[in-house]
Amino acid sequence: MSTNTTTTNATPELAKESVFFQSNHEDLKNRPKVRGYDFNEGVDFSKLFETYKTIGYQASAVGEAIDEINRMISWRLVDEPLKEGEDDDEERKVTRCKIFLGYTSNLVSSGVREIIRYLVQHSMVDVIVSTAGGVEEDFIKCLAPTYMGEFHLEGEKLRRKGLNRIGNLLVPNDNYCKFEDWIMPILDQMVEEQKTKGTVWTPSRVINRLGKEINHEDSIYYWAWKNDIPVYSPALTDGSIGDMMYFHSYNTPGLVLDIISDIRAINNHAVYSKKSGMIILGGGVIKHHICNANLFRNGADYSVFVNTGNEFDGSDSGARPDEAVSWGKIKLDAKPVKVYSEASIVFPILVAETFAKTFKKKSPEELKLNKRSIFD
């Protein structure tokens, strides 16, 4: 055993140099200082959320997401310099960023549905992508309610009672029976129109028709139909709608869905937009579908992702925005934001500090400019 340890009263130089290592402040000159909200100033939610950017961690990401969405909302073509051959006409004054909104089914099952409905009701977004569950759950809620439950409720007991659990929400199985009673006659009409009128049904056209038929102001897709906002669902059969189509194919066979027309339509929404923005809640097919459409314009200009996914498994859901930059799905000079959070916590805050604050009804000219042509 070594016995060369020397004990002195002087502090070892190595210890001092290691602990009191001098900082180079050059990289800190333009960085904001960490500071949270002072509740001595009273309760002011706008000021509170403004301080999120300097709180740190995911609060800072929320603050950055608020800024990114506000950039989407505020952009106008008329503010850009005229390019050679362009006219400074009325269309430039009403041309805005085209906003793509994507969300997974669990958010429509939750109370986030009402927030999404608000955005669609007031034409605040231009293109929607949802999973099948995000479509059917909206219609089912118009027919019967979803209830609060608990995460720990036992699956076996719930199954015996005919109660389906979505996290800490409960959906009586009777709701899906009511959904079947409502949708089957509509599917019959679709088959008839396909045969007699030559109607080509796409997932977006089906959702549009169902939005019209539900005729309920609580519905996201009622307002999407009314405001002519396209809703794409590339995996429309992956849910209760698919279950209904399965049963319907035995009773009234022949319904055909054309997915090629929809992929052309959503890609062209991106291709022909002057600026595009993506707000994506959750991951999976909805995230990739929107990002991939924006590849066709060499990337979105503005992007906000909200999900709990991590990138270590190589999943698209967990991928950071920088990975999308490498694929050409987000612009090289963009300032995308990912918030690592469950969307039901964050999205109400984002909407409160962006869309709801700047709400102003779009002019007829603005609405006309964003209308789709897929159903023409």
UniProtKB/Swiss-Prot annotation:
Catalytic residues of the enzyme: K329 (nucleophile)
Cofactor: NAD(+)
Top-level taxonomic group: Eukaryota
Keywords: Hypusine biosynthesis, NAD, Transferase
Enzyme Commission number(s) from the entry: 2.5.1.46
Any one GO cellular component localisation term in the record: cytoplasm
First-tier enzyme category under EC: transferase
Recorded metabolic or biological pathway in which this protein acts: Protein modification; eIF5A hypusination
Keyword Ubl conjugation annotated: no
Gene Ontology process terms (BP): spermidine metabolic process
Pfam families: DS (PF01916)
Residue numbers binding spermidine: E136, E137, D243, H288, G314, S315, D316, E323, A324, V325, S326, W327, G328, K329
Protein residues bound to NAD(+): 105-109, 131-133, 137, 238, 283, 308-309, 342-343
Stated family: Belongs to the deoxyhypusine synthase family.
Protein role: Catalyzes the NAD-dependent oxidative cleavage of spermidine and the subsequent transfer of the butylamine moiety of spermidine to the epsilon-amino group of a critical lysine residue of the eIF-5A precursor protein to form the intermediate deoxyhypusine residue. This is the first step of the post-translational modification of that lysine into an unusual amino acid residue named hypusine. Hypusination is unique to mature eIF-5A factor and is essential for its function.
Entries under PANTHER family matching the protein: DEOXYHYPUSINE SYNTHASE
Protein name: Probable deoxyhypusine synthase
Gene: dhps
